[in-house]
Every structure is written in C-alpha cells, then in structure tokens.
C-alpha cells in the first residue's frame, strides 16, 4: 500500500467556551478566532422568555445528556425562545447543506442561476461517505439540473450533489457571503465535504479517496495520535461550527420569508419536508398532524465518540403554529442517546403547545 500523506493541524485558536445552560437568551459570549470568510456573531432582537415549564424541561434534558448538547427553540407565533447551551459552536456536519441550499435559492432569486440549469458530474466531482449519486456518475457521467442537485443534497444528504451545487453557485465563498449578507450570525461554513472530512480525520484530500473504501483505508493507516489530535481539535473549534441559537433564528427567518422570495421559501421548506434521513430523531417523536421540515447532520466516529449528531428544522403544529428548532450534540457514546434526547425535546415542545392551545 502506498504511504499516506498526513499532517498535524495546528494554530486554530482556543476552544469556544460553552454557554451556560439557560432558558434566557444570553447575547454575548467569547468566541475563538474565526477562519477567513467566516462571520462574527451578530446581536439579534430580544425575544420573550419561554414558558417556564418548557424551559425547565429542556434544561433537565440537556443536563442529563452523556456528552455536549445545545438546544434552541423559537416560537414564531409567540416570539419566545428557549435555549440550552445555545451559544457554543457545534459541528454542523451535513446541516451545513441547508446554507448551500439557501445560497442557491438566493442566487435564483437574484437571477444569477436557474434551478433548470444543466450540470454534468464526472469522477472528479465525487466526494466521500454518503453519495447515492455516485453510481450514476460512475456509469459514464451524469447530467442533471441544479434543482435536482439541491433536492438530492437536502433530502438524501448526498455529499457529491451538495458540493457540485456549491461549486456551481460560486463555491464556499458564495455561501459565506450569503451568511454574512443576511446577518445570520454565529454560523461558519467550510470548504465542502472533501476538505472538511479529510481535515477532521487528519488527512490531506486526494481524489483517489472518493472511490471504494480508499478514504477509510487511508484514515485507518494514520497513527492514532494523529487522528485523536485532529478529531479533538475539530470538536473544540469546529471549522463548520454553528451556535444552535443562530441556527434556530436563521430557520425562523427562513420560515417568515426574510431570507428568500416567497416562492423560493415555499420550495425550500417543501424540499426540507421531504428529507429521508434522521428517522429516529425528531421525526420519530411527532404526533399525528405535526410536520417536520429539516436537515440532519452526522459526524465521524472516533473511538465511540461522534463528531456531531444534529437535527435542525421547522416543527409545525396541526393548527399552523411553527417552531424553529436546532438540536446539536456531541455524544460521548454512539448508543442512541442523541436521538433519544431529540425525541424528548420534541415531545416537550409538543406537550407545551397542546397544554397552551388545547391540543
């Protein structure tokens, strides 16, 4: 086997301090230095205090978790916000595909691209991990539309579809510019799945990793000390990090039509409602008539610790009341505890809604 190139990743600044568990918004917290093109947290409008019983439940759920968790829930109707450790930066993983989609729809709104624009994917576009589109690409190339890439990236969390969409609208900088222009706050965006995942592992990306199990073999060939240092550095200061509060507030603005045109807003939320991933997360706790338009994210597993298990989206009650929710976790064990926590938070939000609105 050929030797594997790897590097130690130094100089990324201090870890972001974890926010204190609180049901009240805290508007300032120290953040690590941001990478070029990233955005400093912005001050947002103050919301009302969340219902005390719900805030207490979310705090109790968060404190009982085996790992690190951040939760933010925003009621769009009543303008309250319930937070737990919601200013800490958490790994987004595939949740960052949402911002690629928003940037793409924003480009559509500005007339820069059309969702009907054709694109062709070849072997050089392949990424790693989950990429269902790979079989079509390996069959001699695959021509599709930007709209199809967006749908596949969100609903199936396809890494290759996402990265091709990102490059088609201007690359990582276009996404970062959108985040900054729309004042989304404490949300970072890295350079796509290939760059992100290889850096987390302690590797330098090679396109050969996109085929078969080459990435896994290269990662396994690294000294454990390299993998551990790279993984822990990412957990401390994630290159794609986002604060649950910023994510929930961004989702609330999306739902309210503040980020995109009415047509693009409806289309993106409809696509998010078709998401197939995360069946054991928030969706598993829904009661009849409730809807969940969302994006999931799952990180790499190193010695049983997961670099992010997340579910973010818009929870809608049968009466139309909408809640923006961001639940972001770094579990100490891959034992299903993160998924259970998400279900418990969802049940608490639904129970609070039913108690206050009569079911």
Regions found by a protein language model. Give the residues of each.
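Bacterial N-terminal signal peptides that target proteins for export
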Residues: 1-10
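Structured C-terminal helix/loop/strand segments within mature extracytoplasmic catalytic/sensor domains
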Residues: 24-61, 167, 172, 232, ...
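Active-site-adjacent loops and short helices of periplasmic peptidoglycan-processing enzymes
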Residues: 26-204
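Short, flexible turn/loop "capping" segments at secondary-structure junctions
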Residues: 154-157, 226-230, 320
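Active-site-proximal helix/loop microenvironment
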Residues: 187-263
């Amino acid at each position: 086997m050929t030797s594997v190139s790897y590097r130690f990743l130094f100089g990324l600044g201090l870890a972001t301090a974890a926010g204190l568990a609180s049901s009240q918004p805290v508007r300032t917290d120290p953040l690590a230095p941001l990478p070029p093109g990233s955005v400093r947290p912005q001050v947002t409008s103050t919301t009302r205090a969340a219902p005390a019983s719900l805030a207490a439940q979310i705090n109790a759920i968060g404190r009982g978790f085996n790992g690190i968790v951040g939760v933010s829930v925003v009621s769009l109707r009543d303008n309250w916000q319930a937070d737990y450790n919601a200013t800490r930066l958490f790994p987004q993983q595939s949740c960052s595909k949402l911002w690629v989609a928003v940037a793409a729809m924003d480009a559509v709104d500005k007339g820069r691209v059309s969702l009907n624009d054709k694109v062709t994917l070849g072997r050089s576009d392949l990424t790693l991990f989950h990429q269902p589109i790979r079989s079509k690409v390996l069959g001699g190339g695959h021509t599709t539309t930007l709209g199809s890439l967006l749908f596949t990236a969100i609903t199936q969390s396809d890494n290759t579809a996402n990265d091709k969409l990102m490059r088609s609208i201007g690359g990582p900088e276009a996404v970062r510019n959108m985040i900054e222009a729309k004042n989304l706050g404490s949300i970072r965006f890295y350079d796509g799945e290939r760059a992100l995942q290889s850096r987390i592992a302690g590797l330098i990306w090679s396109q050969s990793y996109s085929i078969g199990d080459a990435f896994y073999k290269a990662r396994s060939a690294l000294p454990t000390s390299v993998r551990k240092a790279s993984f822990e550095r990412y957990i401390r200061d994630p290159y794609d990090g986002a604060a649950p509060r910023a994510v929930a507030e961004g989702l609330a603005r999306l739902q309210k039509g503040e980020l995109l045109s009415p047509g693009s807003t409806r289309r993106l939320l409809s696509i998010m409602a078709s998401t197939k991933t995360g069946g054991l997360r928030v969706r598993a706790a829904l009661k009849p008539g409730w809807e969940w338009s969302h994006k999931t994210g799952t990180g790499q597993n190193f010695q049983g610790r997961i670099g992010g298990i997340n579910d973010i989206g818009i929870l809608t009650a049968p009466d139309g009341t909408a809640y923006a929710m961001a639940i972001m976790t770094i579990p100490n064990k891959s034992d299903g505890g993160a998924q259970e926590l998400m279900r418990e938070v969802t049940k608490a939000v639904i129970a609070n809604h039913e108690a206050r609105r009569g079911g």
